[in-house]
A protein has these predicted regions:
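Acidic (Asp/Glu)-rich catalytic clusters
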Residues: 8-14, 45, 63-74, 94-103, ...
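N-terminal binding-site loop/beta-alpha segment at the start of enzyme catalytic domains
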Residues: 1-74
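Beta/alpha (TIM)-barrel catalytic core signal, keyed to glycine-rich beta->alpha loops juxtaposed to Asp/Glu
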Residues: 4, 113-262, 268, 276, ...
Length: 318
């Protein structure tokens, strides 16, 4: 059985292992809605009851199709990237309701990512989400962030219910400190009553060759209520569920979900074309084209040496 955590404000429990929907969508693996739906259905059929997505991920259709006809309760979290824009935030709420085919959004976050959580940038969107929570359209509101200071600011904010921070064993992607400092901020936020669900435990797939250690590092932190793990095949769902439930994992399943099944992907929305990855690629597989990093998959050997040099965590192995 997958471990669960109870969320008082929703009146239900969620599995600590959640399905992260970013990698399956057009920004990364580019699964069709039907292919993505197979992953979603495999996840819920395996007992996963928590899914994370966002307006910009383009995966609402994948999720809605995967849940069509499913009778179990599934909690979905999504995000708005609207800054200083109440109108856009309202549009994102309506888009989520329609796209996910729901009459209520369980959790909706300000998609801060690498931007600071400040009243100037995010106040209007947060106010919009809070209003939607008050009228029953949204269950809980909060932020997603790669920043320690933003976690701390959200922990002090009286309207924040949920914090979705970046945390992994090497601190890859944290923009303003170390793993230990982020863990300290997470513990403070949890003590303040915030529901914490983590992202990037595998650093965008870069720790897939050491996934057992990477997953245990995050799941063993009691202050982290749940962890989103990106999965793009039913076999990956099976591996994660079995491993985190303490069930035997066959060598065959491990081999089928290992590095050989992955590809290097650049998140273009995050990439600024700085060229650091190109400089550190010893195989000539990376170049800058039209201001963005590009991968020659014929030359890429998935060594992952480029990823630590990307300050924006734009390089993913999916």
């Amino acid at each position: 059985m997958i471990e669960t955590r109870y969320i008082p404000k929703l009146g239900r429990s969620v599995t600590r292992l959640g399905l992260g929907a970013l990698p399956m969508g057009p920004l990364q693996r580019k699964l069709t809605p039907r292919e993505g739906a197979e992953v979603v259905r495999a996840a819920v059929a395996s007992g996963i009851t928590f899914i994370d997505t966002a307006t910009m991920y383009g995966t609402y259709e994948h999720i809605a199709l995967g849940l069509r006809g499913w009778n179990g309760t599934v909690t979905i979290a999504t995000k708005t990237h609207a800054q200083k824009d109440r109108s856009m935030a309202r549009e994102h709420v309506e888009k989520a309701l329609k796209g996910l085919d729901r009459d209520r959004i369980d959790i909706m976050l300000c998609h801060c990512a690498r931007s600071a959580f400040t009243e100037e940038l995010w106040g209007p969107s947060l106010e919009t989400l809070v209003s939607a929570r008050e009228n029953g359209t949204i269950g809980m509101v909060g932020i997603s962030t790669h920043s320690i200071q933003s976690v701390r600011a959200a922990a002090r904010h009286p309207e924040i219910d949920v914090i979705h921070p970046l945390i992994n064993m090497k601190g890859m992607g944290i923009i303003d400190g170390t793993t230990d400092e982020m863990l300290e901020a997470i513990r403070e936020a949890h003590a303040a009553g915030k529901f914490i669900y983590a992202m990037k435990s595998l650093a965008g797939g870069n720790f897939v060759t050491d996934r057992e250690k990477a997953l245990r590092f995050v799941f063993d932190c009691e202050e982290i209520d749940a962890v989103m793990v990106g999965m793009v095949t039913p076999l990956e769902v099976e591996w994660n569920v079995r491993f985190l439930s303490g069930l035997p994992v066959s060598d065959e399943l491990s081999e089928k979900t290992a590095l050989q099944s992955k590809v290097l992907s650049i998140v273009e929305l995050a990439c600024i074309g700085c060229g650091e990855c190109v400089e550190h690629c010893e195989n000539g597989a990376l170049s800058i084209v039209d201001g963005k990093a590009r991968v020659d998959h014929g030359l890429c050997i998935l060594c992952g040496y480029c990823a630590p040099h990307c300050e924006r965590l734009s390089i993913r192995i999916v």
